[in-house]
């Protein structure tokens, strides 16, 4: 089986593929202080929960936006699975034509998402990833990656609001009954929810206007479904987009 690992700022997502089928996937909190052994025991318990062992892993590929964890996870794969992990970075074949001014600056998660979106949904397209940061990536009709926009994520924004405004309580991020909140909690929910809906609609519209295309808009990330249900500008929600992209890139590097 192929183990795909997406190391994000808030969560690490692991998936197990048999061929092109995602058999299992898990999400755990990112902890920069854990050792290779601690991660090894954690992953062993996840595998064990579905009756699998490390010996069934035949390949590993990693995407990471947390460089301090790269070596830890790489060593974990070597020590417990006897596998040398493929890590997304310079020298890896992605098949993506990157037009970014400084290609090495593009986050590996953005590259992986674009590869998966092109393969499954075609170009042109915009990928919106609701992660620790909310990112927008534009790929033109020739499948060329041009870049996009990076904004503070929902979690970062709401945490700043809770921290800096002493009288405002912590609330659940959910769709409110009305855009006009008639109490503090409802007003906060309206501002957060419709503020992010407006952000997505505004940036997507400006990209479309600037490039003169009608791209497919693909959303991914934990809260993608919540916001996609409120706006017609998002056409597809794919929560496993990054895992799919990792599998595709792994295959492209086996020849």
UniProtKB/Swiss-Prot annotation:
Cofactor(s) named in the record: NH4(+); K(+)
Annotated residues for binding of substrate: 100, 107-110, 184
Record InterPro entries: ATPase_NBD (IPR043129), Type_III_PanK (IPR004619)
Subcellular location, record wording: Cytoplasm
GO biological process: coenzyme A biosynthetic process
Residues bound to ATP: 6-13, 132
Entry EC no(s): 2.7.1.33
GO cellular component assignments: cytoplasm
Keyword Cell inner membrane (UniProt): no
Keywords for this protein: ATP-binding, Coenzyme A biosynthesis, Cytoplasm, Kinase, Metal-binding, Nucleotide-binding, Potassium, Transferase
Cofactor note: A monovalent cation. Ammonium or potassium.
Active site (record annotation): 109 (proton acceptor)
CDD domains: ASKHA_NBD_PanK-III
NCBIfam families: baf, PRK13318.1-1, PRK13318.1-6, PRK13321.1
Subunit-level organization: Homodimer.
Record PANTHER family: TYPE III PANTOTHENATE KINASE
Family the entry assigns: Belongs to the type III pantothenate kinase family.
Protein name: Type III pantothenate kinase
């Amino acid at each position: 089986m192929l183990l795909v690992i997406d190391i994000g700022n808030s969560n690490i997502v692991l998936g197990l593929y048999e061929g092109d089928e995602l058999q299992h996937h898990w999400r755990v909190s990112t902890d920069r202080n854990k050792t290779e052994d601690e991660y090894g025991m954690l992953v062993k318990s996840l595998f064990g929960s579905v009756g699998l062992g490390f010996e069934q892993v035949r390949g590993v590929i990693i995407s990471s936006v947390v460089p301090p964890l790269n070596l830890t996870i790489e060593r974990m794969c070597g020590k417990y699975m006897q596998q040398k992990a493929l890590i997304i970075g310079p020298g890896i074949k992605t098949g993506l034509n990157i037009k970014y001014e400084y290609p090495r600056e593009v986050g590996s998660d953005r590259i992986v998402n674009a590869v998966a979106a092109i393969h499954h949904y075609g170009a042109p397209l915009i990928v919106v990833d609701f992660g620790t940061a909310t990112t927008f990536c534009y790929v033109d009709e020739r499948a060329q990656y041009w870049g996009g926009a990076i904004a503070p994520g929902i979690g970062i924004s709401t945490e700043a609001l809770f921290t800096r405004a002493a009288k405002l309580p912590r609330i659940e991020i959910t769709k409110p009954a009305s855009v006009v909140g008639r109490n503090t909690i409802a007003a906060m929910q309206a501002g957060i929810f419709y503020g992010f809906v407006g952000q997505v609609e505004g940036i997507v519209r400006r990209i479309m206007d600037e490039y003169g295309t009608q791209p497919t808009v693909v959303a991914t990330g934990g809260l993608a479904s919540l916001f996609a249900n409120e706006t017609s500008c998002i056409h597809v929600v794919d929560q496993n987009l990054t895992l799919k992209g990792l599998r595709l890139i792994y295959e492209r590097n086996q020849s």
